[in-house]
């Protein structure tokens, strides 16, 4: 997809209408005296959409670098090489918003800044979406340095805002810089011609400029409501923060629907790759455990078996390191953008509306899906597996990026994953029906589940209690390596770089996502054992019958396993719904009762 940065549109339009550069504006336009004074400042904010339209200078985070077509960042246009996925700017272009904790860096030209005035000239608000219908009804919330929300520093020609509290995910924020910020000569900092065009009350010279100008006016009005003198504002920006956990929760919701209606009802159409019906039917099942000796201390017994888990990454040698998760549904952002785009053809709009109507999705659903969890739970399953082909034969949202607007991942394969199970010996009295409380253990980077066989950890955890410990390898670790022709099988247990994947950052991100989903779905498989035990089948289940279905499941994670556990605890315990049935399903199949996280990130 070709990304369109609004900043480039603005710069190109201004260039066509006779603007010179940041030092001059041709045509002798009428300029507001306040703007005119600001433009004469020796020290100005470094924001330039005019001088070089092919390489605009923008201040991030900003709405100017958002792609309205699919709701993602368009930062790859700012990268030297937009195809180089090791560049964070390119990777950010695959996400649905800006960081919740990354510092805001604002550069200036001219003189150095006066550090004593740094905190006086910066303001940050949590707001509604200025493009939404209900924006005016949402009062802005002011974040301050005094309340510990952020700290502002000035050094040289750079103003740095350090977020000491993370911003909310999938939320709207606006920041402003005012002339209360001074340079070392004691003079007010000023705006550039680029911002002057957006701030001016004179109508934009071309239609393409109007959205940015309208947003700037709305933003300055919002700061005025919050008590900031808009005549002092020399720059504003609005930005959306990235979602956190939406994709993983969508994966959990898809699993819940698969449990309820069958896996084939969820993983179908464009939401599934080359997966056979036989493999699909194995999802969330476990083979009976077989004896594999004892722990290193000889105290407890080790068993092994297979668990069948959904896998959303590629496994082929030529794809596993370069292909991130893909969405199994068309993007809601792409759908809404097309329907609201004045330049879109009536034929395409008719096609989309006809499809939505056929699938049972209303216009009200589209309006509320971003904010109403109940509507989300309705719409996402209806779109999963679907494809929209436009009048020219092209597919709407052919990129199928994973975002909060298209969070359901495409199933690439059903993985047969080896599990390890550690149980107390017969002499303990624990080898009886419904005796053992269940825990899941997850190892760290470069390690493997074999830690349960080669260390004293399981003996320490079990001690003298009736406790069962399950473990599987992280993706690409241990028994889950990748076979490379001419090389053999490689694993992250010896080559951690294949998991971290700094060459293709989105794949590194999704390796971690897959790690979390594996634990969620292992928990589901254990929950299915619990359900069978509760139905009175313990006698026929052999070793599995010894598990206690009434004590829930705990999680123990070390290093990368602890990092996985942070997300697992959040998503596994996030309710699927409010009904009694939803709560029962969460407790039986998903919830994690206790978390023990050692050295996350170490």
Model-inferred region functions:
Residues 21-324:
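Acidic, low-complexity Ser/Thr/Gly/Pro-rich repeat segments typical of extracellular/periplasmic
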């Amino acid at each position: 997809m070709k990304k369109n940065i609004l900043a480039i549109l603005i710069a190109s339009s201004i260039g066509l209408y006779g603007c010179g550069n940041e030092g001059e504006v041709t045509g002798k336009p009428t300029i507001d005296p306040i703007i005119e004074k600001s433009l004469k400042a020796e020290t100005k904010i470094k924001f330039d959409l005019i001088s070089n339209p092919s390489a605009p200078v923008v201040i991030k985070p900003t709405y100017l670098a958002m792609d309205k077509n699919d709701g993602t960042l368009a930062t790859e246009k700012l990268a030297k090489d937009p195809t180089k996925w090791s560049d964070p700017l390119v990777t950010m272009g695959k996400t649905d918003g800006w960081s919740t904790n990354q510092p805001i860096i604002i550069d200036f030209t001219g003189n150095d800044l006066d550090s004593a005035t740094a905190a006086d000239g910066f303001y940050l608000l949590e707001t509604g979406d200025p493009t939404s219908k209900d924006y005016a009804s949402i009062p802005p919330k002011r974040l301050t340095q005094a309340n510990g929300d952020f700290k502002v520093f000035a050094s040289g020609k750079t103003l740095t805002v350090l977020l000491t509290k993370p911003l909310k995910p999938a939320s709207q924020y606006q920041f402003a810089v005012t002339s209360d910020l001074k340079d070392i000569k004691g003079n007010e900092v000023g705006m550039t011609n680029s911002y002057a065009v957006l701030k001016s009350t004179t109508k934009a010279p071309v239609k393409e400029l109007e959205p940015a100008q309208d947003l700037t006016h709305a933003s300055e009005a919002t700061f005025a409501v919050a008590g900031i003198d808009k005549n002092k504002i020399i720059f504003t920006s609005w930005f959306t923060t990235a979602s956190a956990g939406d994709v993983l929760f969508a994966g959990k919701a898809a699993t819940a629907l698969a449990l309820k209606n069958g896996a084939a009802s969820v993983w179908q159409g464009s939401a599934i790759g080359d997966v056979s019906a036989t493999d699909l039917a194995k999802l969330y099942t476990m083979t009976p455990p077989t004896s594999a000796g004892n722990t290193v201390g000889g105290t407890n017994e080790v068993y092994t078996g297979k668990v069948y888990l959904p896998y959303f990454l590629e496994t082929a040698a030529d794809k596993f390191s370069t292909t991130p998760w893909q969405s199994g549904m068309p993007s809601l952002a792409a759908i809404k953008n097309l329907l609201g785009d004045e330049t879109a053809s009536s034929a395409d709009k008719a096609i989309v509306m006809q499809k939505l109507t056929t699938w049972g999705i209303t216009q009200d659903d589209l309006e509320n899906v971003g904010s109403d969890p109940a509507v989300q739970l309705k719409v996402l399953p209806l779109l999963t597996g679907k494809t929209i082909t436009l009048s020219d034969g092209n597919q709407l949202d052919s990129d199928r990026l994973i975002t909060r607007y298209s969070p359901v991942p495409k199933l690439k394969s059903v993985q047969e994953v080896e599990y390890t199970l550690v149980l107390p010996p017969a002499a303990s009295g624990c080898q009886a029906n419904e005796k053992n409380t269940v825990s899941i253990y997850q190892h760290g980077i470069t390690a493997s589940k074999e830690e349960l066989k080669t260390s004293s950890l399981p003996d320490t955890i079990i001690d003298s209690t009736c406790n069962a410990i399950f473990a599987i390898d992280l993706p690409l670790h241990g028994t889950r390596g990748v076979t490379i022709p001419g090389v053999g099988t490689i694993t992250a247990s010896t080559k951690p770089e294949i998991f971290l994947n700094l060459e293709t950052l989105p794949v590194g991100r999704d390796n971690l996502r897959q790690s979390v989903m594996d634990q969620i779905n292992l928990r589901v498989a254990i929950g299915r054992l619990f359900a069978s035990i509760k139905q009175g089948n313990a006698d026929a289940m052999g070793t599995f019958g010894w598990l206690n279905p009434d004590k829930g499941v705990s999680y123990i994670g070390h290093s990368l396993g602890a990092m996985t556990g942070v997300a697992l605890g959040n998503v596994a315990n996030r309710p699927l719904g409010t009904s009694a049935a939803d709560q029962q399903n969460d407790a039986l199949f998903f919830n994690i009762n206790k978390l023990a996280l050692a050295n996350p990130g170490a």
